Regions:
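Conserved H-loop
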Residues: 288
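Feature for exported/extracytoplasmic and membrane-associated proteins, marking the mature portion
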Residues: 2-285, 304, 318-384
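Acidic/histidine-rich, metal-coordinating catalytic segments
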Residues: 292-299
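A post-motif C-terminal structural segment
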Residues: 300-304, 309-318
Length: 384
């Protein structure tokens, strides 16, 4: 086999030999969902009582009679209505106004800042999770659905990546098995990587059997789209006792420069439908208290709409935190619509405060890469 073919097969594996012996003991799992492209926070968590909202957005403002109102001032986009049970159970936290000083409107640079937890004028080669999570030779610490996640780059974390669990088990592993059987002594490193990778497959057999029992791969109650199916796979992974410390997913399409009403509405509907099914399944299987779901996006959108029925790259935006141990409700302060800076919202909560909360309250880490004096944790998670 050509070297490039081999590399394409093993891409995404970094599993230590000791990972194979890890038991199926339950553990806490953080599920990170990237709303890729920059979600418009102002039409997600809506300050409908502020008259400036409809003034800034004469055609994009969600009509009052369609809003899912949380209180007398704040509402959610109607497409998020399937999260109502989670909200009513006080298991949905909405962190308002997340951003950082001297915001950058470039997708690439702002993405780097969010994934590395760096300052606006600082360059880092490692992701904030790679810097935060302690190394464990005895476990697979992360599962990545889709492209490699920058929050995990650098360091020595053990991870495995896949597009879909079913596809991974049916297509990629047979090729790896054939390659492993043909490896010779001169390919000792290759043989070692393959052996460890294939051994991890044994722990996925329960997942494979469950997938086969489900029949057609249509996503079911999660929804018939790639994100929904990947979230369904993640739920099955957690329910099967294979939860790593971190699972990452991406929901693409939030760069809504035009036709935003329809595009964002569909994306938020896909998000809420899949998350509602995910929560229901984990509650049924007794793993909801062990799971924390957090959304993030590289930036929000401009306060005002553009001439194309959309919004351009902006700054601050809200994010969601869901789980059985979450302290639900509104956290932080909605950015002012009357005190804009260069036509942008001014952030009220630094996004690294969210990361500090995860390190302190979810993983109970006394030390992490986050400067907790500058970025104090929010009160988001109940103790176990």
């Amino acid at each position: 086999m050509h070297r490039r073919n081999f590399l394409s097969l093993i891409a995404g594996f970094a599993v230590s030999p000791a990972a194979i012996a890890k038991s199926n003991a339950r553990k806490q799992c953080l599920l990170l969902i990237e709303l890729q492209g920059g979600n418009d926070g102002l039409n997600t968590v809506i300050p409908f009582a502020d008259k400036a909202y409809s003034t800034l957005r004469p055609t994009l403002a969600i009509k009052n009679d369609k809003l899912w109102k949380l209180d007398e001032k704040t509402a959610l986009h109607p497409s998020l209505h399937k999260l109502n049970d989670c909200w009513q159970a006080d298991q949905l936290a909405i962190v308002q106004g997340l951003g950082y000083e001297n915001p950058n409107r470039s997708h690439f640079r702002s993405h780097d800042i969010w994934t590395s937890a760096s300052e606006f004028d600082q360059r880092k080669d490692s992701g904030w999770l790679a810097d935060t999570l302690p190394e464990e030779n005895s476990t697979v610490q992360a599962v990545i659905y889709g492209n490699r996640s920058s929050v995990l780059q650098g360091g020595e974390l053990n991870y495995i990546s896949m597009h879909r669990t079913r596809e991974f088990l049916s297509a990629k592993l047979p090729k790896l098995q054939a390659l492993e059987s043909n490896a010779n002594n001169s390919q000792r490193h290759v043989h070692s990587v393959l052996k460890n990778t294939l051994a991890y497959q044994q722990r996925l057999r329960a997942v494979a059997k469950s997938l086969e029992a489900k029949g057609p791969d249509d996503g079911g109650e999660f929804g018939n789209n790639l994100f929904a199916k990947q979230l369904q796979d993640a739920a099955l992974l957690i329910s099967s006792g294979l939860a790593p410390s971190v699972i990452t997913l991406h929901l693409k399409g939030f760069d809504t420069h035009a036709n935003q009403i329809e595009r964002q509405g569909k994306l938020l509907e896909n998000l809420s439908t899949a998350l509602a099914a995910f929560r229901a399944q984990l509650i049924q299987n007794g793993h909801w208290d062990d799971t924390l779901v957090v959304t993030w996006s590289e930036f929000g959108r401009r306060a005002g709409e553009n001439a194309s029925g959309g919004t351009d790259h902006g700054t601050a935006a809200p994010q969601f935190v869901l789980g059985g141990r979450v302290k639900g409700g509104l956290h932080g302060q909605q950015p002012s619509l009357s005190e804009l800076q260069n036509d942008d919202l001014v952030h009220t909560v630094d996004f690294r405060q969210l990361y500090a909360s995860l390190a302190e309250q979810w993983w109970t880490l006394a030390d992490s890469s986050i400067n907790k004096k500058r970025y104090p944790a929010l009160d988001l998670v109940k103790s176990a």
